[in-house]
């Protein structure tokens, strides 16, 4: 676990009107919370997209022909990078606004809390966390709960199991 401040560079782009979407400062706060104590320096990009772009990316990269809530694209460390050279690029997150809004409504969650959860979830994927089996999912979900609790956000998995 690392201590001290995180040097964070988060590029945020909106591919649809910003009305009703979280501000860039919120996304940065959620990313910083997910990285706190885990990494000291990070560069990443977040793109908030519509359903058409979300579906296109999910189809192209995952072979699934529907829009999903969040996609994580971890950066590859360049081959031949000298040992000891820092490579702070974490990767990219794509968050599909209509899917997030629909899920928040269906699950009775506050919209901003759901965005926070999915941002944290996506950042953890960029850090190498996964949920391919029950044990991995349980560990990742517990970490998400802890991070979100630090942000004052309720357990997003309450009542699911």
Curated annotation (Swiss-Prot):
Q: Which GO terms describe its biological process?
A: rRNA processing
What's the source species for this entry? Stenotrophomonas maltophilia (strain R551-3)
Compartments it resides in: Cytoplasm
The similarity comment for this entry is:
Belongs to the endoribonuclease YbeY family.
Note how many cofactor molecules are bound and how: Binds 1 zinc ion.
Indicate which residues the UniProt annotation says bind Zn(2+). 121, 125, 131
Matches recorded under PANTHER family: ENDORIBONUCLEASE YBEY, CHLOROPLASTIC
**Cofactor(s) the protein needs:** Zn(2+)
Could you tell me one molecular function GO term of this UniProt entry? Answer: metalloendopeptidase activity
Keywords for this entry?
Answer: Cytoplasm, Endonuclease, Hydrolase, Metal-binding, Nuclease, Ribosome biogenesis, rRNA processing, Zinc
- The protein's role, per its UniProt record: Single strand-specific metallo-endoribonuclease involved in late-stage 70S ribosome quality control and in maturation of the 3' terminus of the 16S rRNA.
Going by the entry's taxonomy, the superkingdom of the source organism is recorded as Bacteria
What is this protein identified as? Answer: Endoribonuclease YbeY
Q: What is its EC number?
A: 3.1.-.-
What top-level class of enzyme does the UniProt entry assign?
A: hydrolase
Please tell me one Gene Ontology term that the record gives under cellular component: cytoplasm
């Amino acid at each position: 676990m690392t201590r001290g401040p995180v040097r964070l560079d988060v590029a945020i782009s909106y591919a649809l009107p910003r009305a009703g979407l979280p501000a860039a400062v919120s996304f940065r706060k959620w990313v910083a919370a997910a990285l706190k104590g885990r990494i000291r320096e990070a560069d990443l990009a977040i793109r908030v997209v519509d359903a058409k772009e979300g579906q296109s990316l999910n189809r192209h990269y995952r072979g699934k022909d529907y829009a999903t809530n969040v996609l994580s694209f971890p950066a590859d460390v360049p081959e031949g990078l000298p040992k000891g050279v820092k490579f702070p690029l974490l990767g990219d997150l794509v968050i599909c606004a209509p899917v997030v809004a629909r899920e928040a409504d269906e699950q009775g969650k506050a919209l901003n809390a759901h965005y926070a959860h999915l941002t944290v979830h996506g950042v953890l994927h960029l850090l190498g966390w996964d949920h391919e089996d029950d044990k991995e999912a349980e560990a990742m979900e517990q970490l998400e709960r802890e991070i979100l609790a630090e942000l004052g956000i309720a357990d997003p998995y309450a009542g699911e199991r």
